[in-house]
Amino acid sequence: MAKQKIRIRLKAYDHRVLDQSAEKIVETAKRSGASVSGPIPLPTEKSVYTILRAVHKYKDSREQFEMRTHKRLIDIINPTPQTVDALMRLDLPSGVDIEIKL
């Protein structure tokens, strides 16, 4: 018998919201009887943007901004139909991007 697996990737700019969402998903999956692997922290993506402070001159004066994208991975092994139904009804914050692969 082949094992079924649901792979969930979460992305967010705020790691606290991301961890809360991951805990909700893990808790929901465990409550419905599936075994869960994760949340596994994936490498944080860091984008750095450099801009000039002045409009026309003073090229040596620059300012840097960074944007960090935190990621988590959750595997749900042998999900039941109740697990899938509970995950579809789960309400997560708007700042979290969810990618689900079956």
From Swiss-Prot:
Disulfide bonds: none
Keywords: Ribonucleoprotein, Ribosomal protein
Listed PROSITE patterns: RIBOSOMAL_S10 (PS00361)
Domain of life: Bacteria
GO BP term (any one): translation
Any one GO cellular component localisation term in the record: ribonucleoprotein complex
Segments traversing the membrane: none
One Pfam family matching this protein: Ribosomal_S10
Gene3D superfamilies from the UniProt entry: Ribosomal protein S10 domain
GO molecular function: structural constituent of ribosome; tRNA binding
The keyword Transcription regulation belongs to this UniProt entry's keyword annotation: no
HAMAP family given in the database record: Ribosomal_uS10
Quaternary state and interactors: Part of the 30S ribosomal subunit.
Family of this protein: Belongs to the universal ribosomal protein uS10 family.
Chain's role: Involved in the binding of tRNA to the ribosomes.
Cited NCBIfam families: PRK00596.1 (NF001861), rpsJ_bact (TIGR01049)
Protein name: Small ribosomal subunit protein uS10
